[in-house]
Amino acid sequence: GGMPEAVECYAKNRHFSEVRTIQNEILNAYVLDFAKHAPHQDIPKLMQVWDSIPAQLARENRKFQFAALKSTARARDYENAILWLENAGLILRCFLITKPGQPLTAYADRSSFKVYALDIGLLGAMARISPEILVHGHVLFQEFKGAFIENYVAQTLVGITGGGLHYWKNEAATAEIDFL
């Protein structure tokens, strides 16, 4: 991940457990910031969205599923929470493109999107993946590894381009391009 304090800690000590402690402190600070800065009525929904990120990414179809938050959840009920997290820079949204044309934003389906964590290291902490598993691999990590790498690419692209993530899939959902 790109969190300066965590990177500095690893560069000095080379102890993943200390880095994970810092990452968990950062995550806890974000949750406290929800209570300080977010509209009071949105805080429970912010927490639901925030806590769901690893599970949303773990699924084969990584499109954000509101029903994964709550069986009766609807997009309009969670839009403010998602916008708040996005505007705070805590999540990255990647919108489905209905056809690959320019400009991409003209063909974006704003109701169909994927959500990524702002930082790959923090995603590992959110998912409670042992740093040793990340470094050395493990058979249990194979399935989530694709989502983890996809999040890394999203984070890197936003760092290079400043934002505007988009993906494409055909109508039959037999082909997909993760990033355009």
Language-model regions, residue ranges each:
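Amphipathic alpha-helical segments of the small helical/lid subdomains adjacent to P-loop NTPase cores
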Residues: 1-3
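Accessory nucleic acid-recognition modules appended to NTPase machines
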Residues: 5-180
